[in-house]
Amino acid sequence: MPKMKSKRAAKKRFSITASGKVKYKQMNKGHIMTKKSQKRVRRLKKSAILSEADSMKMRKQLLPYG
Protein backbone atom coordinates (compact mmCIF):
# COMPACT_ATOMS: atom_id res chain seq x y z
CA MET A 1 0.00 0.00 0.00
CA PRO A 2 1.57 3.35 -0.95
CA LYS A 3 2.02 6.10 1.57
CA MET A 4 -0.95 8.47 2.01
CA LYS A 5 -0.11 12.08 1.24
CA SER A 6 -1.73 15.34 2.26
CA LYS A 7 -3.29 17.48 -0.47
CA ARG A 8 -0.64 20.04 -1.43
CA ALA A 9 -3.19 22.69 -2.45
CA ALA A 10 -4.92 22.42 0.93
CA LYS A 11 -1.60 22.52 2.77
CA LYS A 12 -0.71 25.82 1.09
CA ARG A 13 -4.05 27.50 1.82
CA PHE A 14 -5.05 26.24 5.28
CA SER A 15 -3.33 25.79 8.63
CA ILE A 16 -4.43 24.15 11.87
CA THR A 17 -4.30 26.19 15.08
CA ALA A 18 -3.18 24.84 18.45
CA SER A 19 -6.80 24.36 19.51
CA GLY A 20 -7.51 22.30 16.36
CA LYS A 21 -9.43 24.90 14.35
CA VAL A 22 -8.68 25.41 10.66
CA LYS A 23 -7.48 28.90 9.73
CA TYR A 24 -7.37 30.43 6.24
CA LYS A 25 -6.82 33.76 4.48
CA GLN A 26 -9.81 35.69 3.14
CA MET A 27 -10.34 35.83 -0.62
CA ASN A 28 -10.91 38.99 -2.75
CA LYS A 29 -7.76 40.72 -1.44
CA GLY A 30 -5.49 40.18 -4.46
CA HIS A 31 -6.16 43.15 -6.73
CA ILE A 32 -8.80 45.71 -7.84
CA MET A 33 -8.92 47.24 -4.37
CA THR A 34 -10.21 50.65 -5.51
CA LYS A 35 -13.78 49.39 -5.87
CA LYS A 36 -13.82 47.96 -2.36
CA SER A 37 -14.55 50.08 0.68
CA GLN A 38 -11.86 50.61 3.31
CA LYS A 39 -14.01 48.83 5.87
CA ARG A 40 -14.21 45.79 3.61
CA VAL A 41 -10.46 45.84 2.92
CA ARG A 42 -9.69 45.96 6.65
CA ARG A 43 -12.01 43.03 7.28
CA LEU A 44 -10.43 41.01 4.47
CA LYS A 45 -6.92 41.50 5.93
CA LYS A 46 -7.74 39.27 8.89
CA SER A 47 -7.57 35.52 8.63
CA ALA A 48 -10.76 33.57 9.25
CA ILE A 49 -11.72 30.31 10.95
CA LEU A 50 -13.40 27.58 8.92
CA SER A 51 -16.79 26.35 10.11
CA GLU A 52 -16.88 23.16 12.16
CA ALA A 53 -18.57 21.10 9.42
CA ASP A 54 -16.06 22.15 6.76
CA SER A 55 -13.07 21.83 9.07
CA MET A 56 -13.67 18.09 9.52
CA LYS A 57 -13.37 17.59 5.74
CA MET A 58 -10.31 19.82 5.54
CA ARG A 59 -8.51 18.07 8.40
CA LYS A 60 -8.83 14.77 6.52
CA GLN A 61 -7.11 16.34 3.52
CA LEU A 62 -4.39 18.04 5.54
CA LEU A 63 -3.75 15.13 7.89
CA PRO A 64 -4.81 11.91 6.16
CA TYR A 65 -3.66 9.71 9.06
CA GLY A 66 -5.06 11.80 11.91
From Swiss-Prot:
Q: Name one GO molecular function term.
A: structural constituent of ribosome
| Biological processes annotated in GO | translation
One Pfam entry name = Ribosomal_L35p
Q: Kindly indicate whether the keyword Cytoplasm belongs to this entry.
A: no
Against InterPro entries, the record matches this protein to: Ribosomal_bL35, Ribosomal_bL35-like, Ribosomal_bL35_CS, Ribosomal_bL35_sf
Q: Does the keyword Ribonucleoprotein apply?
A: yes
Cellular component aspect of the GO annotation:
cytosolic large ribosomal subunit
The alphabetized UniProt keywords are:
Ribonucleoprotein, Ribosomal protein
Would you identify the family this protein belongs to, as annotated?
Belongs to the bacterial ribosomal protein bL35 family.
Q: Which PANTHER family match?
A: 54S RIBOSOMAL PROTEIN BL35M (PTHR33343), LARGE RIBOSOMAL SUBUNIT PROTEIN BL35M (PTHR33343:SF1)
State what protein this is by name.
Large ribosomal subunit protein bL35
